């Protein structure tokens, strides 16, 4: 599963980032992490960047943020799950878009709300960014390993609830999270998938 993060101004849509979603799978499909950019082929990325703006236009979304969740079918076609006229949650809009693309999504949302054209100049070179949510002690062990082996990747660590105090049954019951960013996508992916 993926999502596409866009800013729109006066009916013009700008794709800022595409996000891969990691989940627990059936039965709850709780998101365990996200990564930007995803490992999609150039053809698949182009399909996303072409299809999602058309969907936003069809829904008459003209100004502000959007978070479009989708899957790719076996032929690589975009299949929309839902479109929210908002930034992505779980630190996607607030942190990952900026880290991965250099675009200040929060600022853009404010600018468009004020009727101003958003600033579309990236503040830095693109990177790979990811967030890992804490479900078990294993997630904390991975965090400690990152601190000792690759501390430069660690961008943020949330406050943590004591792990194991309750069962994680939805996004609101996760124990915390940490955010990573760096130039090497394979390295970020490895830390997210351990």
Regions found by a protein language model. Name each.
Residues 1-78, 87:
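Internal nucleotide-binding/catalytic subdomain
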Residues 25-29, 90-94, 155:
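A short, polar/proline- and glycine-enriched secondary-structure boundary/capping micro-motif
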Residues 28-29, 89, 168-173:
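Short, flexible turn/loop "capping" segments at secondary-structure junctions
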Residues 41-48, 102, 185-188:
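Generic structural signal for well-ordered, non-membrane alpha-helical segments
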Residues 46-68, 74, 84-138:
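Active-site "cap" helix and flanking loop/linker of ATP-utilizing ligase/carboxylase catalytic domains
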Residues 80-82:
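Pre-DFG segment of protein kinase catalytic domains
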């Amino acid at each position: 599963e993926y999502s596409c993060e866009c800013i729109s101004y006066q009916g013009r849509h700008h794709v800022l980032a595409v996000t891969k979603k990691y989940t627990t799978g059936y039965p709850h499909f709780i998101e365990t992490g996200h990564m930007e950019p995803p490992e999609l082929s150039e053809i698949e990325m182009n399909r996303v960047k072409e299809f999602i703006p058309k969907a936003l236009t069809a829904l008459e979304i003209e100004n502000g943020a959007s978070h479009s969740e989708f899957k790719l079918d076996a032929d690589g076609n975009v299949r929309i799950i839902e479109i929210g006229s908002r930034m992505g949650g779980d630190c996607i809009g607030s942190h990952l878009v900026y880290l991965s693309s250099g675009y200040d999504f929060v600022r853009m949302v404010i600018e468009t709300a004020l009727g101003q054209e958003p600033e579309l100049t990236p503040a830095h070179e693109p990177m790979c960014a990811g967030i890992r949510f804490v479900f078990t002690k294993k997630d904390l062990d991975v965090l400690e390993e990152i601190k000792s082996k690759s501390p430069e990747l660690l961008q943020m660590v949330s406050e943590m609830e004591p792990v194991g105090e309750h069962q994680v049954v939805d996004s609101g019951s996760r124990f915390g999270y940490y955010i990573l960013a760096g130039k090497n996508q394979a390295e970020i992916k490895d830390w997210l998938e351990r």
